[in-house]
């Protein structure tokens, strides 16, 4: 037996043994309750970072705990393997995307296995594997059959030099292509969409079912769906039979409309533009349509517009208002047109000030109209009194309507209903529910993604690829230049195929799917990962799902989680699933931050100084000698503040790295990397090692003496069962790993300080400490468990249950106060009642001195805590 803790040797040994024993295989015993523990799977970049280690360690602790608690556990891992980096590697280094990706997967799998995670690698999936994306394509066809997939024109980022579509991340802050440097244009292309809006209401309402999710994540999703209740109103165009439809959540402001605004892409822009304005309007539209949506809607940028020369009629007042085109109106939102009410909207107010447009206040604060008579003279007459009230900024609050015809004097709430009712009766409006959520654009003009499985036939139109012909395999004989559009579109031998329906020469769809498609159903495939005949066997998937605990970053709070919920509901409606929501509980772990140095006198990339170039005792810029400032920031290559997991493991071992990550901060909080604290956890594991190995080396046989336990034995047993209770509650209730480890430290200290190390209670304590440590530090726990003479793995042991009787102390410490000031504390029987506690307190010699010669006016007894004498 080695007297020193040598993590490298024992970790390698036990990882190999666990594989041989198959300890991490998914158990299928139907008599056990199931538990599905899942981390969000990674993109195979080639190397793990500390954020990965934190994510997977958290999930691993939960999975190990649940196995020991008697659950059959599914704890899989896979790879979100399609995406742009692999294609860029092909362009820059001439390495095929598949080769680059699978090399990275191999490397990262080895790194994950080095962490000793209890993952069932038999369930591993990679989204770029044909046996996975075959079913991604099959699911797409389910959407197509259900009428939930369709094509329409949509704007993309277009590089005019390379003649290719760019992802948003390939466009810099100046609107230039990352590769060619060309000013990026916006171009309309025919794109594929999924009708997520058909499920908007259910996606919103079912957030209430997610009681195990953080409230802020549910709020983010609700805001993204963006349900609003308002009105659809029509403004006739002067000199035309056409009408401009607008959507507004504030119909109560309609009498304050001073202009109507169209999106530059709106089909009525040409019709409403006069000849004198045509050239200026065309120029403006060209400028705006080359801007991204973010640029157009950024709050910190002034809103730009141009008058068309055309006019529309406010259907409530009969007055003509000018029609404008503005950059901030997006055609994809609402109707692509808005009514401008500068008096009651901040954005409209700034726009009106910039272009000198009228600002007419039609709602006022109740106190500001208290002196006006806003009552009609009869039921058939309107209020004719004009109320001259102006504010120096937009008044956006609800209030009392003024200068609003028959609706004057109403509250905003009442007026909204009355105005919509009036518009409905007159035929130029109606009530309408609107969602911010838009249909999901899934087309990507790239190679490294799942091909969309349809064929375009000149006779039959869009033809689904038959199931028997799936998967549509990505061809390997592709040239990657970064120019000329999608590489697939240039490969005629792949594009040109006969129509499956009529045999006519036809063409494959050359777009691939958004990689969010792949990650929107992977958790379902894990339940039946080797099924070659179907996407999954519904009985198996319905048995394992929903995921009991999902762990991942807050950055996925909206898109990935929303899309996964959408896919689950669609596949349920297709008869494949029998549940509504995919993830029962969600834990969004915080970021891992490193100590970061920066030169405040520099900017951009030059601002950051890699930590390995800095003397932490006197941090200075190695180039200029200027003093550096420091802060904690999320680890990244650009900041040079990262810590390589393999370096930490080589120095301290996997278990120490796990313990630090779990102990340093609650899981939902950001974690500041501090090597001193890493060393602290290493010292703790060394103490546990010595504690157990010294016990084993002593060769003591626990005495099974009969009769009552001694006081010290009772105290130790209470410490043992307090640890069991506290660690279990910390793990089960809210995953407070840091406080659970604190309890392990307390138990370790109690065992170190204990007398009678040959007692059966001490033996119970040693074994309990090792078992409780197992989910956190699995390798050292396994080694110590075997040293204690056990032949089976510690990870197959039953998680201990605390004995409530052991938690009850024979005696407690009673604090005695006189007029609220502590005067003494004494040991009293724990079962003493109020009268007995007062009696013990009065018998204290110290207290008697403080009470001598004084009148006791009141005695306050708090059972189990204190007695307070109030004296005069």
Swiss-Prot record:
GO cellular component entries: cytosol
EC supergroup of this enzyme: ligase
SUPFAM superfamilies to which the protein is assigned, alphabetical: Anticodon-binding domain of a subclass of class I aminoacyl-tRNA synthetases, Nucleotidylyl transferase, ValRS/IleRS/LeuRS editing domain
Residue span of motif 'HIGH' region: 42-52
Keyword Coiled coil among UniProt keywords: no
Keyword terms: Aminoacyl-tRNA synthetase, ATP-binding, Cytoplasm, Ligase, Nucleotide-binding, Protein biosynthesis
Reaction(s) this enzyme catalyzes, per UniProt: tRNA(Leu) + L-leucine + ATP = L-leucyl-tRNA(Leu) + AMP + diphosphate
Gene3D superfamilies per the UniProt record, alphabetical: HUPs (3.40.50.620), Isoleucyl-tRNA Synthetase, Domain 1 (1.10.730.10)
GO molecular function, one term: ATP binding
EC nos: 6.1.1.4
UniProt superkingdom: Bacteria
UniProt: ATP binding residues: 637
InterPro entries: aa-tRNA-synth_I_CS, aa-tRNA-synth_Ia, Leu-tRNA-ligase, Leu_tRNA-synth_edit, M/V/L/I-tRNA-synth_anticd-bd, Methionyl/Leucyl_tRNA_Synth, Rossmann-like_a/b/a_fold, tRNAsynth_Ia_anticodon-bd
Subcellular location: Cytoplasm
Major location (coarse): cytoplasm
Keyword ATP-binding carried by entry: yes
GO biological process annotation, one example: leucyl-tRNA aminoacylation
Short motif ('KMSKS' region): ranges: 634-638
Family label: Belongs to the class-I aminoacyl-tRNA synthetase family.
Name of the protein: Leucine--tRNA ligase
């Amino acid at each position: 037996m080695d007297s020193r803790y040598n993590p490298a040797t024992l970790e390698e040994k036990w990882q190999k043994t666990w594989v041989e024993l198959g300890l991490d295989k998914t158990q299928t015993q139907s008599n056990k309750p199931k538990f599905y523990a899942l981390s969000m799977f990674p993109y195979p970049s080639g190397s793990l970072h500390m954020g990965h280690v934190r994510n997977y360690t958290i999930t691993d602790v939960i999975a190990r705990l649940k196995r020991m608690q008697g659950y059959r556990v599914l704890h899989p891992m896979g790879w979100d393997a399609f995406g742009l980096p692999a294609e860029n590697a092909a362009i820059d280094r001439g390495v095929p995307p598949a080769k680059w990706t699978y090399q990275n997967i191999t490397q990262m799998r080895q790194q994950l296995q080095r962490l000793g995670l209890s993952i069932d690698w038999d369930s591993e999936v990679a989204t770029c594997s044909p046996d996975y994306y075959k079913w991604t394509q099959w699911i797409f066809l389910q959407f197509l059959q259900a009428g939930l997939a369709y094509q329409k024109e949509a704007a993309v980022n277009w590089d005019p030099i390379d003649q290719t579509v760019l992802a948003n991340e390939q466009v810099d802050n100046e609107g230039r292509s990352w590769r060619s440097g060309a000013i990026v244009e916006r171009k309309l292309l025919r794109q594929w969409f999924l009708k997520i809006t058909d499920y908007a209401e259910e996606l919103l309402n079912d957030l209430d079912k997610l009681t195990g999710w953080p409230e802020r994540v549910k709020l983010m999703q609700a805001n993204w769906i963006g349900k609003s209740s308002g009105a659809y109103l029509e403004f006739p165009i002067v000199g035309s039979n056409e009408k401009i439809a607008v959507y507004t959540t504030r119909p109560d402001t309609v009498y304050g409309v001073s202009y109507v605004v169209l999106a530059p892409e709106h089909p009525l822009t040409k019709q409403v533009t006069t000849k004198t304005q045509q050239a200026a309007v065309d120029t403006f539209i060209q400028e705006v349509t080359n801007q991204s949506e973010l640029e157009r809607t950024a709050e910190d940028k002034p809103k730009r517009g141009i008058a068309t020369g055309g006019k529309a009629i406010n259907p409530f007042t009969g007055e003509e208002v000018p029609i404008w085109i503005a950059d901030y109106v997006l055609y994809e939102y609402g109707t692509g047109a808005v009514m401008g009410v500068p008096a009651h909207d901040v954005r409209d107010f700034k726009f009106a000030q910039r272009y000198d447009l009228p600002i007419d206040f039609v709602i006022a604060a109740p106190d500001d109209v208290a002196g006006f008579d806003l009552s009609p003279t009869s039921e058939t007459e309107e209020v004719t009194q004009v109320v001259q009230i102006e504010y120096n900024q937009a008044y956006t609050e609800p209030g009392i309507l003024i200068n609003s015809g028959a609706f004057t004097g109403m509250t905003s709430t009442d007026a909204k209903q009355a105005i919509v009712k009036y518009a409905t009766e007159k035929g130029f409006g109606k009530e309408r529910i609107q969602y911010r959520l838009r249909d999901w654009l899934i087309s990507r003009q790239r190679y490294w993604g799942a091909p969309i499985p349809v064929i375009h036939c000149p006779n039959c139109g869009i033809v689904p690829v038959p199931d028997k012909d799936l998967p549509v395999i990505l061809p390997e004989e592709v040239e990657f230049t970064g120019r000329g559009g999608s590489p697939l579109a240039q490969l005629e031998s792949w594009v040109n195929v006969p129509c499956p329906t009529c045999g006519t020469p036809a063409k494959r769809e050359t777009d691939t799917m958004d990689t969010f498609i792949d990650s929107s159903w992977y958790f379902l495939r894990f339940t039946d990962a080797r099924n070659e005949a179907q996407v999954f066997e519904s009985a198996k998937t319905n048995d394992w799902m929903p995921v009991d605990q999902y762990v991942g970053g807050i950055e996925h709070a909206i898109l990935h989680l929303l899309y996964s919920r959408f896919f689950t509901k669609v596949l349920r409606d297709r008869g494949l699933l029998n549940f509504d929501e995919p993830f029962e509980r969600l834990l969004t772990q915080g970021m891992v931050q490193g100590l970061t140095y920066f030169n405040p006198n520099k900017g951009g990339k030059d601002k950051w100084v890699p930590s390995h170039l800095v003397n932490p005792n006197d941090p200075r810029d190695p180039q200029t000698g200027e003093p550096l400032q420091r802060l904690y920031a999320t680890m990244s290559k650009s900041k040079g503040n990262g810590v390589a997991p393999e370096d930490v493991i080589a120095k301290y071992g996997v278990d120490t790295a796990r313990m630090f990550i779990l102990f340093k901060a609650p899981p939902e909080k950001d974690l500041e990397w501090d090597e001193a604290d890493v060393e602290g956890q290493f010292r703790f594991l060394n103490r546990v090692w010595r504690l157990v190995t010294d016990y084993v080396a002593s060769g003591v046989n626990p005495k099974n003496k009969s009769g009552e336990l001694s006081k010290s034995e009772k105290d130790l047993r209470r410490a043992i069962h307090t640890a069991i209770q506290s660690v279990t509650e910390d793990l089960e209730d809210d995953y407070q790993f840091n406080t659970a480890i604190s309890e392990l430290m307390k138990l370790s200290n109690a065992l170190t300080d204990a007398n009678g190390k040959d007692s059966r209670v001490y033996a119970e304590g040693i074994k309990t400490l090792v078992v409780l440590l197992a989910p956190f530090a699995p390798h050292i726990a396994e080694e110590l468990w075997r040293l204690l003479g056990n032949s089976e793995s510690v990870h197959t042991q039953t998680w201990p249950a605390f004995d409530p009787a052991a938690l009850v102390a024979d005696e407690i410490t009673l604090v005695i106060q006189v007029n609220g000031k502590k005067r003494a504390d004494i040991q009293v029987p724990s079962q003493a009642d109020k009268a007995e506690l007062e009696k013990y307190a009065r018998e204290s010699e110290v207290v008697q001195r403080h009470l001598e010669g004084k009148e006791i006016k009141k005695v306050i007894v708090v059972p189990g805590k204190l007695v307070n004498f109030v004296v005069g």
